Amino acid sequence: MDIEKVNSMDLGEFVDVFGNATERCPLIAAAVWSQRPFSDLEDLEKHFFAFIDALAQSGQEGILRCHPDLAGSELQRGTLTAESQREQSGAGLRSLGADERLRLAELNAQYRARFGFPFVLAARFSDRTAVPRELARRLLCPSAQELRTALGEVKKIGSLRLADLLRADPAKL
């Protein structure tokens, strides 16, 4: 899909297409729509990320809370968004053994208890062995640093998803 197509979308179509660029946060797409026209993918990204950056900390934490646990119960039940399903499966998280799933569940619970939001990682840049290592490492980070890191991961995920959408055949959206 080209940027002209993006710029010609009405609000409903734009939210339908871009509403999950940030996991389960169609409000961001609805807000970004009013910033049209976009010159290119980077400009579109800039507006998505500026919206996130402009939020108060509680809003940023809310965005993080919209993300599922990696290899969590939603993956096991098959209730992830299509994007998260592909990303987590691609990182090998669907094929974890019972011990690996248990270890990740324990780390996810510790992380949530410590920071108040789920561990967010751009799974496309990771794999089943790196995820628990990174989760354990980030558990030791100061809260303010971890908020910045987690939001950086949200932006990596968003960047990949936006690029996927702009490369996609509009007839398949």
UniProtKB/Swiss-Prot annotation:
Family: Belongs to the OHCU decarboxylase family.
Encoding gene (name): URAD
Keywords: Decarboxylase, Lyase, Peroxisome, Purine metabolism
Entry superkingdom: Eukaryota
Entry function: Catalyzes the stereoselective decarboxylation of 2-oxo-4-hydroxy-4-carboxy-5-ureidoimidazoline (OHCU) to (S)-allantoin.
An annotated Gene Ontology molecular function: carboxy-lyase activity
Tissue: Apparently not expressed.
Pfam families in UniProt: OHCU_decarbox
Pathway assignment: Purine metabolism; urate degradation; (S)-allantoin from urate: step 3/3
Chemical reaction(s) catalysed: 5-hydroxy-2-oxo-4-ureido-2,5-dihydro-1H-imidazole-5-carboxylate + H(+) = (S)-allantoin + CO2
NCBIfam families per record: UHCUDC
Gene3D superfamilies tied to this protein: Oxo-4-hydroxy-4-carboxy-5-ureidoimidazoline decarboxylase (1.10.3330.10)
Location(s) in or outside the cell: Peroxisome
Name the record gives this protein: Putative 2-oxo-4-hydroxy-4-carboxy-5-ureidoimidazoline decarboxylase
Binding site for substrate: P68, S84, Q85, R86, E87, Q88, F119, V120, L121, A122, A123
UniProt motif (Microbody targeting signal) ranges: 171-173
Annotated active site: H67
EC number: 4.1.1.97
Enzyme type, top EC level: lyase
A GO cellular component annotation in the UniProt record: peroxisome
Gene Ontology biological-process entries: allantoin metabolic process; purine nucleobase metabolic process
